[in-house]
A protein has these predicted regions:
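Short beta-alpha junctions and helix-cap segments that line functional grooves
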Residues: 61, 74-77, 84-86
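Short histidine-centered beta-strand/loop micro-motifs
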Residues: 36-43, 77-79, 88-90
Length: 134
């Protein structure tokens, strides 16, 4: 993953150049097709996912409860807390995703501690919005 491209993604935009280069080493970029189930409700969460391009629906009990697009992040609550996915997320268009595993975040947390704080704030906001997936 290219550090310059990471800087264009809102989650990473405030990181220093050094931190961006560190994250770029560990971030995995994946392309998926429309209809692909990105996460399954009830599965254990081991990574956070950032939508770089495309859109997805969050599905809970068979109902679409939210739509996600570029810049949106999901999976970080379950990943940080070691919990299970709280909803299915399904691609509604071709997508490009950036993922970071729990283990990768542990390895780079000194470089990106300010970003982890931002994730904690995001989590607090999600606690107030049950439509957001973990």
């Amino acid at each position: 993953m290219d550090a310059d491209h990471l800087k264009t993604i809102p989650l990473f935009s405030s990181l220093s150049e050094k931190a961006l280069r560190t994250v770029a080493v560990f971030a995995a970029e994946t392309s998926v097709s429309k209809g692909k189930r990105l996460v399954h409700e009830g599965d254990y969460a081991y990574d956070l996912i950032v939508i770089d391009e495309g859109t997805a629906d969050v599905i809970k009990d068979g109902q679409v409860v939210a739509s996600l697009g570029p810049g949106d992040v999901f999976g970080e609550i379950g990943m940080l807390e070691g919990g299970k996915r709280t909803a299915d997320v399904v691609a509604t268009s071709p997508m490009r995703l950036v993922t970071l595993s729990k283990w990768d975040l542990k390895r780079i947390e000194n470089e990106v501690s300010e970003q982890l704080e931002a994730l904690a704030k995001e989590r607090a906001e999600r606690d107030r919005d049950p439509a957001r997936p973990s």
